Amino acid sequence: MKSYMAKPSDVERKWFVIDAEGKVLGRLASQIAKILMGKHKPTYTPHVDTGDFVVVINADKVVLTGKKLEDKYYKYYTGYPGGLKQIQYKKLMQTKPEFVIYHAVKGMLPKNRLGRRMIKRLKVYRGAEHKHQAQKPEKLDIE
């Protein structure tokens, strides 16, 4: 008996909506990454992009446990000498909560061509409204 290998032409993609209100950032991000990779499907094949689309709403209401809001920093380099910048997560949550979820999920995806293709299927919105009603997304509850 041969093992099943998914082909890119056989992949059927669904749309899911996840409400991030009151959810812990890391736990939420790992579940989203699993859906983007397609690991929740029995047809999962590591070298084929079998994942689904994910729309995250209420990104501004995601929770960080402990004192991470004050202690954790997002660091980035501008490309100039002395250009290592850091922003406290508390400030980042106020200005760009969509980026916090995007960055957490991106770190859990493969660091290759497949991962770059997978992250494009993640749509994150600050409030409860999103513009993907036409795709008829299915509501997904994550604990």
Curated annotation (Swiss-Prot):
InterPro entries: Ribosomal_uL13, Ribosomal_uL13_bac-type, Ribosomal_uL13_CS, Ribosomal_uL13_sf. It comes from the Bacteria. GO terms for biological process: negative regulation of translation; translation. Keywords: Ribonucleoprotein, Ribosomal protein. Pfam families: Ribosomal_L13. GO terms for cellular component: cytosolic large ribosomal subunit. The keyword Ribonucleoprotein applies. The keyword Isomerase does not apply. One of its GO terms (molecular function) is structural constituent of ribosome. This protein is one of the early assembly proteins of the 50S ribosomal subunit, although it is not seen to bind rRNA by itself. It is important during the early stages of 50S assembly. HAMAP family: Ribosomal_uL13. Belongs to the universal ribosomal protein uL13 family. Part of the 50S ribosomal subunit. This is Large ribosomal subunit protein uL13. It comes from Caldanaerobacter subterraneus subsp. tengcongensis (strain DSM 15242 / JCM 11007 / NBRC 100824 / MB4). The gene is rplM.
